[in-house]
């Protein structure tokens, strides 16, 4: 649903912020 999709998007952005060099 929309809510879990929004959470997943924020979580993805969070992972990008904490591990930018890993990707």
UniProtKB/Swiss-Prot annotation:
Under catalytic activity, the entry for this protein gives: K(+)(in) = K(+)(out); Na(+)(in) = Na(+)(out)
Topology relative to the membrane, per the entry? Answer: Multi-pass membrane protein
Per UniProt, subcellular location reads as: Postsynaptic cell membrane; Cell membrane
Q: Name one GO cellular component term.
A: postsynaptic membrane
Question: Chief subcellular site?
Answer: membrane
Q: What molecular function does GO assign, one term?
A: transmitter-gated monoatomic ion channel activity involved in regulation of postsynaptic membrane potential
Alphabetic keyword roster: Cell membrane, Ion channel, Ion transport, Ligand-gated ion channel, Membrane, Postsynaptic cell membrane, Receptor, Synapse, Transmembrane, Transport
Q: Indicate yes or no for the key word Repeat.
A: no
KW Transmembrane helix (keyword) present = no
The record's similarity note reads: Belongs to the ligand-gated ion channel (TC 1.A.9) family. Acetylcholine receptor (TC 1.A.9.1) subfamily. Gamma/CHRNG sub-subfamily.
Q: State whether it acts alone or in a complex, and with which partners, per the record.
A: Pentamer of two alpha chains, and one each of the beta, delta, and gamma chains.
What does the UniProt function comment say about this protein? After binding acetylcholine, the AChR responds by an extensive change in conformation that affects all subunits and leads to opening of an ion-conducting channel across the plasma membrane.
Know the name of this protein? Acetylcholine receptor subunit gamma
- Name its species: Electrophorus electricus
């Amino acid at each position: 649903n929309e809510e879990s999709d929004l959470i997943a998007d924020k979580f993805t952005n969070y992972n990008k912020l904490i591990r930018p060099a890993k990707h």
